């Protein structure tokens, strides 16, 4: 039986691995505290929580696959009750997510009913070089299938994406695996099909409750799998009083004075992502203005 100590060693970790004789590479990630921290300050409907979990896992896997310095934003916009779902992650596996809901969303509501008429936008912003943006139609039943199609079309490589969200020992968890044929052309469709068939047998409790090494052994015990050192994953918002103050100064002095008068001399700027409050009185705002000049 797997003990708590066994499985928690790989909570909030991302691993890369390579099949030595198959020319196929893989990634595995599990979000525990990272996912909980994302949800803690919001009362999202269950269907929205699950969608954000899928998008977060996919973003982690995408940043690891592309191997670049910078950040990636995965964003859904629509005209349904879910107006926006957004995830941003970087090459350090720091990730944040938020959603905007305007309407009733039931627990088992489908992706298309939540979003209505919408699109999936992936923005890749390297620290150096040109920014890239891809717009993907939401023509598949799940976001995982839409993203898998994106991987295949954008990189022209056979790719399998498995993402699950749920609970393990009473706590939210999101986890996933990516398999991709090597870009050097040495992999065969037969090798890829063999490995993806095995991966498709993975159970939720295995993804959520096993260390990476044990999970890979269960799935691929007849294969030689090289497992590389893990990378930590964490929730990181990046908000600050300075950024909130800069946003506040985008509105006119007249509007600022009206808000100050309405709210007893203090403006509360709350971060939409992590829920942190930043308070600005007249003196603080004048100081911001002086430093901006």
From Swiss-Prot:
Gene3D superfamilies associated with the record: helix hairpin bin (1.10.287.480), Hsp33 domain (3.55.30.10), HSP33 redox switch-like (3.90.1280.10)
Classification via CDD domains: Hsp33
Cross-referenced InterPro entries: Heat_shock_Hsp33 (IPR000397), Heat_shock_Hsp33_C (IPR016154), Heat_shock_Hsp33_N (IPR016153), Hsp33_helix_hairpin_bin_dom_sf (IPR023212)
Domain of life, per lineage: Bacteria
Post-translational modification: Under oxidizing conditions two disulfide bonds are formed involving the reactive cysteines. Under reducing conditions zinc is bound to the reactive cysteines and the protein is inactive.
Signal peptide extent: none
Main location: cytoplasm
Location of the protein in the cell: Cytoplasm
Disulphide bond pairs: 237-239, 271-274
GO biological process: protein refolding
UniProt-recorded Gene Ontology molecular function terms: protein folding chaperone; unfolded protein binding
A Pfam family this chain is assigned to: HSP33
Sorted UniProt keywords: Chaperone, Cytoplasm, Disulfide bond, Redox-active center, Zinc
A GO CC annotation given for this chain: cytoplasm
Function of the protein: Redox regulated molecular chaperone. Protects both thermally unfolding and oxidatively damaged proteins from irreversible aggregation. Plays an important role in the bacterial defense system toward oxidative stress.
Family: Belongs to the HSP33 family.
Protein's recorded name: 33 kDa chaperonin
Record organism: Haemophilus influenzae (strain PittEE)
Encoding gene (name): hslO
């Amino acid at each position: 039986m797997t003990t708590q100590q066994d499985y928690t060693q790989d909570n909030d970790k991302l691993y890369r691995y390579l099949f030595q004789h198959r020319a196929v590479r893989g990634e595995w990630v599990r979000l525990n505290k990272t996912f909980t921290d994302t949800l803690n300050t919001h009362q999202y409907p269950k269907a929205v929580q699950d969608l954000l979990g899928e998008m977060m896992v996919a973003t982690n896997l995408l940043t690891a696959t592309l191997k670049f310095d910078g950040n990636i934003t995965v964003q859904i916009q629509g005209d349904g009750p879910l107006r926006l779902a957004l995830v941003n992650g970087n090459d350090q596996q720091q990730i944040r997510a938020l959603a905007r809901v305007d309407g009733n969303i039931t627990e088992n509501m489908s992706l298309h009913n939540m979003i209505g008429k919408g699109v999936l936008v992936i923005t890749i912003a390297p620290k150096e070089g040109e920014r890239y943006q891809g717009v993907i139609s939401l023509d598949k039943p799940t976001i995982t299938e839409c993203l898998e199609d994106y991987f295949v079309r954008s990189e022209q490589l056979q790719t399998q994406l498995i993402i699950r969200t749920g609970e393990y020992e009473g706590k939210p968890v999101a986890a996933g695996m990516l398999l991709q044929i090597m870009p050097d052309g040495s992999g065969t469709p037969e090798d890829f099909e063999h490995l993806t068939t095995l991966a498709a047998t993975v159970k939720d409790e295995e993804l959520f409750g096993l260390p990476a090494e044990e999970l890979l052994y269960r799935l691929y015990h007849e294969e030689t799998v090289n497992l590389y050192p893990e990378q930590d994953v964490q929730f990181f918002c990046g908000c600050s009083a300075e950024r909130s103050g800069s946003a506040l100064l985008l509105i006119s002095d007249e509007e600022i004075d009206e808000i100050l008068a309405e709210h007893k001399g203090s403006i509360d700027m709350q971060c939409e992502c992590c829920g942190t409050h930043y308070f600005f009185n007249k003196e603080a705002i004048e100081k911001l203005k002086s430093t901006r000049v």
